[in-house]
């Protein structure tokens, strides 16, 4: 995380084993974002402070796709320069439209696709949800509730069909950083100058 309050909670309560478990489930570099950190911290606080309820919490079975994958996706699909100009020009509509188009039509680097394929092997044909977990999301004072997409994947059919469904879900979540609600929320919170980075949960 890059959020100081969240960082303090994590450093105070997490063990070396907790960090290792996240690392084992992480795809790509960078941080895992606000929503993922919030989820992990909430689970840890229940475990430490309300052990009588810990047994009722479902076992953690999520993977984390780091913010560096989003950055690489931008570069790989010729979006990085456009995104930088878009931010400098205070999220101008023309750049928003073009950037959304490129994000929705992009492709992932092959090494990331290989790791995603391994992740699908882990889940088998169990349905999954690709959830946004941006740097700003669910941080102190900036909830971003419902501003970015979460995509349900049936995860059925051939391996190729399941991979395509997963990649399309990732593209949609990445593109949701450009939706009108998210931009307006950033504008109201005076966050247009902040480089929003998207991790996935």
Q: At which residue positions do the language-model features occur?
A:
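Nucleotide/phosphate-binding sheet-loop regions of phosphoryl- and nucleotidyl-transfer enzymes
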Residues: 1-201
